[in-house]
Design a protein with these regions (language model features):
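Sec/Tat-exported extracytoplasmic proteins
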Residues: 60-68, 81-85, 89, 112-116
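Bacterial N-terminal signal peptides that target proteins for export
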Residues: 1-13, 22
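Hydrophobic pocket/interface hotspot
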Residues: 60, 77, 85, 139, ...
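Surface-exposed, charged secondary-structure patches
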Residues: 86-87, 91, 96-149
Length: 194
């Protein structure tokens, strides 16, 4: 879910969320009530977007990707996520401490929309590993982020998708991501051919 640059969005989200009184996971109260957005009605999904785990992941990448100035279809994004879903970025601060910045889908839209439109952003999956049990699937999706569709990636990393099949459709429960950096290069097993 790298944007403008994954680092810029992660830093922006971290700062904006701190200003919005959202805190890293370690500082959150587990007994806190669910946010209002978790009870809002979810827009109807396109059947093709939620027909398989592959389809729902492709739909997420598709909805966040687009050229500079292009509005994103945020209702399509909302339709992919289970109510109460979370998007979480692992961010390394200037002090070297890694924290998890937790966002609702609405937080992500509010923070990401201006950045995605300002610079253009394309993210695609380069490789995937998957674990499955019953109706749940955990996917490590190696991503490549670009400002233009055919440009060299400016960022790579892992999007960790947790998915649920409810018997009728697939839902995204969580996306948890971290960008590659010099301290954490992507292992070969998460690269094409790995």
């Amino acid at each position: 879910m790298g944007h403008v640059s994954l680092r810029k969005l992660t830093a922006f989200c971290a700062l904006a969320l701190a200003g919005a009184s959202l805190q890293p996971v370690a500082a959150q109260n587990a007994a806190a009530p669910a946010p209002a957005s978790s009870t809002a009605a979810t827009p109807a999904a396109r059947p093709a977007d939620v027909a398989s785990e592959d389809a729902v992941i492709k739909a997420v990448y598709d909805v966040i990707s687009g050229p500079k100035g292009q509005p994103r279809d945020w209702d399509r994004m909302r339709s992919l996520f289970v109510p109460g879903a979370r998007l979480i970025s692992a961010h390394t601060g200037d002090d070297g401490i890694v924290t998890a910045h937790v966002m609702t889908v609405e937080d992500y839209i509010r923070l990401g929309d201006p950045l995605l439109k300002k610079d253009g952003f394309f993210e695609r999956e380069a490789h995937r590993t998957e674990d499955r049990f019953g109706n749940i699937v955990q996917v490590f999706s190696t991503y490549e982020s670009r400002h233009e569709a055919d440009a060299k990636p400016f960022q790579r990393g892992i999007n960790s998708f947790q998915l649920l099949f409810d018997g009728k459709r697939w839902w995204v429960v969580t996306i948890y991501w971290q960008g590659e950096d010099s301290a954490n290069p992507l292992p070969a097993k998460y690269l094409p051919g790995g």
